[in-house]
Each structure stands twice: as structure tokens, then as C-alpha cells.
Amino acid sequence: MHNHPRHEGHLHTVNVKYGYVVFLLSIVHIVVVATVPRLRKVGSSSTRRSLPWLPQIVIWAILLAILGVWNIHEWSEHYNVSIKRFGRMAYCLLPFDILLAYKYWPLENYLQNLNLHKWMSRIIVVCSMIHGIGYFVKWFVEGTFFHHLFKIDNLLGVVVFAAAVVLLVVSVALFRRQSYRLFYVSHNITIGMFVVLILFHARPPVTLFVAICGLLLAILFFIKFQTYSATPVSLKEVPNSSLVLVSFPWPDHIATSFKPGSHVRINHSNRSWKSWVFASHPFTSATLPGTSETLDLVVKKGTFIFAKDTQYNLSSPYTSLSFDDNSISRFDQSVIICGGSGISLAIPVFKYLITKLDVTMIWCTRSKADLFVLRHYSLLDKVQVYITGNDSLSVEDESEGHGLMHETIELENLEESSKNSEATKQPEILRGRPDLNNVCASLETTPNSSCVISCGPRSLVKDCENWCRNHKIESVTEIYEM
């Protein structure tokens, strides 16, 4: 790849072993993440839980910080060895980070792995920035900045460095939520540049890791297009509602794979350039085979535009939460609290749990017009509804209920005819936000056999998580956001 080595002597190759150390540690990490939840399940009827992602990130940050400066003598003379090492360690972590982005693999909770992927990516970017900024400072101090900068192999590294900085900025939650597409495109471009350009930049070469990354990305790309095509059989919406009920035919070859809480990813047809450039969108199936003739999605208007007589690509189902007889066997009662389009996960889970234990379902939504969803599934008299907006709510709000659980509207009954609601199959409708101490009060008498399932916007889920933490009650959560 290079006509002659840039550096002579043992210092040129001293960092190679550290790259292999980091790679081997990442393999150990994969094995641990894959096996620990299964070991926890052996001999226990408790819910299988993934390892918390935050301690894993902290451990990696500490390990890399130690390895980055390990065994460097005469620091003032050989500090450049540390600078080079951070760059190599960053690249050798890339296969692990790519693997964490897989949606179909045996490492348990996909959404939990997504958090790990997000923060591992940031660690890789930080290590790369230490490498890049370190060399910028070195060249500037030596007075050789422009001499080194415009050498082709160095310039390729600078290009990757610039892309990584841009990615770090657009990955911040504020920017990512405002324009997920910009983040997604930037992310893919940066990964592609990282994998390819570093092949020509790194000294000594990282050919093995380039090959591994290339293989993993090729598999990921192949999986992305392992979809089936389907056309909506119906689109149901009502005036003033922010929700749309979209129905697809069940895919014959994978219909039995759907479980309560299963998700599918939907994208435009392969004939559209959008399917090649933009990310597919995750949706939760509100129905299950055997109980419904169609695969139904409850979609917030504006998140993904569906049109009848238009073909879409649908992925195989995947789950981030496990609801089966074994995982719920230790629970006697549960409260399901959902917000907005989070009703799509709550409906099949509620229908499954209601035959197993004492379960209450609460739905926080912006408008009474959204109740057509409950009416469609004959759940009007089985759900407590909290209206957090008003009937003239604009449906163009992109934030899926930011601050949903922080409204200060005084609680009041909206249904004057609530006393005969059972006869007319009307839900219990209240204005404002639910008081978790009130709606979950029954769980406090048996905290060890109770759980709260929350799904929807981040604010709602975090409120429920905090309440459960304070009352030592198990929390099962899913946040609805890209």
C-alpha cells in the first residue's frame, strides 16, 4: 500500500498489539452481552433483562484511557506513540460498533444495544479526535503543519476527522430529533469514509479490520433489503386526530413470528431512491395473527406518509420486549401506561396480559378524536383515557408529546354521562395528566409481583421509570422516537 514505511524502528509497530487487544476485548464483550441474560434466566421465571449500557460505556472509556498511555516511557519524546495508538484503537473498535447496529441477532434487546451502539460510536469519534488533534498540535509546534497536512495519506485522515466532527455535532439529541434524516445520511457517509479511507491512511495497515468491517457492512446492507413488499389495504383517520390506522395484509411466510410488542421496519419501495438513502421507520404491530386479518399500525401523522395503492417494503418482525408465559409468570398485576401512538404496543400487550393477570391500561393522548382507535378495537370501556390537549390540537407538532406528563391542567371529568358509561361503552375520560401515585396505588401493596409497562414519548416513559425506581417496582419501557 505504501512504497516505504513512514517511521523506522520498533516504535512503528508498537501499537499494533494494542489494536488486537481492543479487538479481543470487544469479542469478550459480545460473548458477555450474549450470555449473561440467558444465565440470569436459568432456574428463574423472571423477565430476561439485558445488561445496563451505561456501566459498559464507562468501563470502555476507562480501559481505552489506560491503554492509550500504557507503557510509554520518556513521554516528552514518545507522546506521538500515544497519539497514534488512540487512532488505531478507534478503528479496531469499529467492527464491534457495527455489530451493535444489527437489528436481528442473538444479543437480546435491540433497543438496549442501540444505546450501546450510540455511545460506543461517540467513544470511537473521541479517540479519533484525540488522534487527529494530537497530530495537528504536533505539526504546528514543529512548524511542519502544512508540509504534513497535504500529504495524501494524512489528508485522507483529515477528511475522516472532519466528517467525524460533523457526525458528533448532528448526533446530539437536539439536532438528531429535529432532522433524523440529516443525522442518518451523515452517519452512513462517515462510516463509509472511515472504513475505506483509513485503509490508505493507517500506518501500519489495518487490512484485517477493514475486511471485517466491509463484511459486516455488506451483511447489514443485505439485511436492509431482505424485506417483503405490501400495499396498505386500508387507511383510517378521523378529523382533528393526530393518528392514522394503517392496515397491511399479513405476510404468509413470517406471520407466525409476530408476538405482542413486535415491530416492523417500513421503507419506500426499492424503486424509490428514498429507500436507498434514508432509514426505514420502525412501527409496532397493534394486532397479532389469529386475532386479526390484517397487520395494523397506529401511526402519528407526519412521521411517515402512507398512501393507498402504494407499495412499501416491510421487514421481518423483531422484538425489544419479551412477553410470554415465562417472562410474566411472577407478576400478579400490571399497569400499562401509553402515550400517543404508543397505544400500538399497548393494545396487543393488554390483550395478552388480561387473560393472565390483573391489568389496567391508561392512555394519554392529545385529542378526544384519537379515541377512534379504541373504538376500532372494541376497547372503549376497558381503557382509562387522559386528554392532555384540546380538540383543536394541531396535528403538525413533530414532538410526539414532548412534556406530555408535565401538563398543569387541573384534573376534571370530561364525560357528563360517565355514570352510565358502561351501558354506552364509553371510556373513562379525564383531562390533564394522570397522577402516578393514584393510578399505580394498587401496585404498592405487592411490589415484588407487580410491574409498570410504559410506552410512548420520552417524557412519559421517564416519569414512569422514576416512579417505579422510587417505589421499587419493576419497570418495562419503550420510548417512541427515532
UniProtKB/Swiss-Prot annotation:
SUPFAM superfamilies: Ferredoxin reductase-like, C-terminal NADP-linked domain (SSF52343)
Record-listed E.C. numbers: 1.16.1.-
Class of the enzyme per the UniProt entry, highest EC level: oxidoreductase
UniProt keywords, alphabetically: Electron transport, FAD, Flavoprotein, Ion transport, Membrane, NADP, Oxidoreductase, Transmembrane, Transmembrane helix, Transport
Domain Ferric oxidoreductase: 86-198
GO biological process: reductive iron assimilation
Residue ranges constituting the FAD-binding FR-type domain according to the UniProt record: 225-348
Protein family: Belongs to the ferric reductase (FRE) family. AIM14 subfamily.
Function description: Probable cell surface metalloreductase. May be involved in iron or copper homeostasis.
Protein name as it appears in the record: Probable metalloreductase AIM14
Organism: Meyerozyma guilliermondii (strain ATCC 6260 / CBS 566 / DSM 6381 / JCM 1539 / NBRC 10279 / NRRL Y-324)
